[in-house]
A protein has these predicted regions:
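Helix-loop-helix units of permease transmembrane domains in multi-pass membrane transporters
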Residues: 76-108
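Pore- or pathway-lining transmembrane helices of multi-pass membrane proteins that form conduits
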Residues: 19-25, 165-183
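Transmembrane alpha-helical segments in integral membrane proteins
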Residues: 67-81, 159-169, 224-237
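Hydrophobic alpha-helical segments typical of transmembrane helices
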Residues: 73, 84-85, 157, 197
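Secretory targeting signals
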Residues: 24-71, 101-165, 206-211, 215-219
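Hydrophobic alpha-helical interface/terminus motif in multipass membrane transporters
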Residues: 77, 86-89, 121, 125, ...
Length: 241
């Protein structure tokens, strides 16, 4: 708990928490503005109202979420790398793996808050603007959970990368390259491409149905835990040079 409290203070100071809160607010605002401007066009699409609400608005929200994750993870080790502080932590009564786990938990919780803010906006739109009886809260909750879960491999992967490179431009470049390659591959039906975390985060955005894909969700969970385990192992056994 002490490590978590210290990390919370650090992430407030280096801007990680404000970045993810801003992502949630901007995503919610985008949903409102987009639906207001395109309401008639969206509701006339040959899709079920809930599919329109969730899949047609999620694309840009996903981009905001992705770059919010990339920026936050690039910033999260900034304080540790200043003055090579992270190298000295091994001589202090501080657990570097515990610090890594706390950073992961803080990122996860704050990203979940962002997802909740965005989906509160979608719920408001659904209750107010969809045809009577068309809004389904259960469908919204399932899609929100699905979009959160499919984003977690990128968060876990980017934290792993950021923890190993002192120059934040390296993980930032990897994040941008991952996004571009994910965009190019997301529409492919080849299951092997699901090993690419940036393909997984794009799956809800390119789907025409709001129903979660259980295969994608399972792979997302496995990748998230795998990247987390690798990051914890490196933090414990691979000291910073």
């Amino acid at each position: 708990m002490k490590t978590l409290a210290i990390e919370l203070r650090k992430e407030k100071r280096n801007g990680v928490i404000p970045v993810l809160l801003a992502v949630g607010v901007l995503g919610a605002a985008y949903a409102f503005v987009n639906f207001i401007m395109r309401k008639d066009t969206l509701l006339n699409l040959p899709l079920a109202p809930m599919d329109v609400l969730l899949t047609q608005l999620y694309g840009m929200i996903m981009v905001l979420n992705l770059f919010g994750i990339v920026v936050a993870t690039c910033m999260i080790y900034n304080m540790e790398f200043k003055g090579s502080a992270v190298k000295k932590m091994y001589m202090l009564p501080v657990s570097v793996p515990a610090m890594y786990l706390c950073k992961f938990l803080i990122l996860t919780v704050m990203f979940l808050v962002a997802i909740v803010l965005q989906n509160l906006a979608l719920a408001q739109i659904g209750m107010m603007d969809l045809p009577d009886g068309a809004f389904e809260m259960g469908t919204l909750v399932r899609f929100a959970g699905y979009s959160f879960l499919t984003s977690m491999p990128v968060l876990s992967f980017m934290l792993l990368i950021s923890s190993r490179f002192e120059n934040m431009w390296v993980p930032l470049g990897i994040g941008v390259a991952g996004f571009l390659s994910g965009m190019a591959l997301a529409n492919s039906g080849l299951a092997l491409l699901l090993v690419h975390p940036f393909v997984i985060i794009l799956k809800p955005a390119v789907a025409m149905s709001a129903q979660p894909d259980s295969t994608v969700a399972l792979v997302a969970l496995v990748e998230t835990l795998l990247f987390l385990a690798v990051g914890l192992w490196l933090a414990k056994y691979r000291r910073y040079e």
